[in-house]
Amino acid sequence: MSVWFTIPSARPVEEAEKVLKLWRQQGYKIALWRDAEGDMQPGVYDVMMVDLSVSYPGYAKAVNALITEVVGRDPSAEWFVIGGDDTEPDPSHTAEEIARDLSAEFYNRTPFQDWKRWSTFGVMQPTGDRFAGGSIDRIAGSAWIGREFARRINQGNGPLWPEYHHMFVDEELQNVAIKYGCFWQRPDLIQLHRHFMRANEKTTSEAVVKPIPEHLVKWNTPEHWKESKLIFNTRKANGFPGSEPLP
């Protein structure tokens, strides 16, 4: 069994490495999507993909590509954790400990008797970090995604709906997992999100106005928010068409 932290990373190398080190220490393998080739030190990641296109494909497409790549390379990969290079792993549980809990839980939730197929058809979001008034309760922003969920949901086109570039992709993920009865929130797990608007390191930290990091400016505009919200609201009103899982 292996668990992979699968994220795009745009932070300066030295900043990203501080976070990636924590994930590796807890037993995770790491797959990164970077915008520039050759700027990460060897040993920091297990799989690295580089954006060679004219523009960044967006968070959803990047994560989907990473998960697809890992599934093809690592038959032991059972769970994938999304988020960002500002998200830390739960410090009190190893990757394997959490993964075993999840596989047992999701297997018990289904009437099907096929362990390999259904024990990883699920999404789990740690909610112990109560940043910004517990905003994590409505989004699967640093979720654990099971191998079979990733392979089957959205008609086999990846776990994240590809229309989203940054905002609302995590809210759709949560809603879709709820729709198919395979979503679990765990307040006992803390994956601290060092959001740029975080006031302090307490799990109850409020959000305060701060300058937007350069690599996030493009995705934190009113225009992008409005565009993404329209996609989400339209899809939600129609029952998230195309989200159906493969049999």
Please describe what each predicted stretch is.
Residues 3-15, 33:
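A conserved hydrophobic helix/loop-capping motif in glycosyltransferases and polysaccharide synthases
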Residues 12, 165-247:
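C-terminal catalytic/acceptor-binding lobe
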Residues 76-90:
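Short beta-strand-to-loop acidic/aromatic patch adjacent to the donor-nucleotide binding site
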Residues 109-141:
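Short beta-strand-to-loop element that shapes/binds the nucleotide-sugar donor at the catalytic cleft/hinge
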Residues 11-26:
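Short, well-formed alpha-helical segments that are part of the catalytic scaffolds
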Residues 35-77:
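Active-site-proximal specificity loops/subdomain of glycosyltransferases
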Residues 91-112, 151, 169-170:
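Short alpha-helix within the catalytic core of nucleotide-sugar-dependent glycosyltransferases
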Residues 141-156:
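Conserved nucleotide-sugar donor-binding
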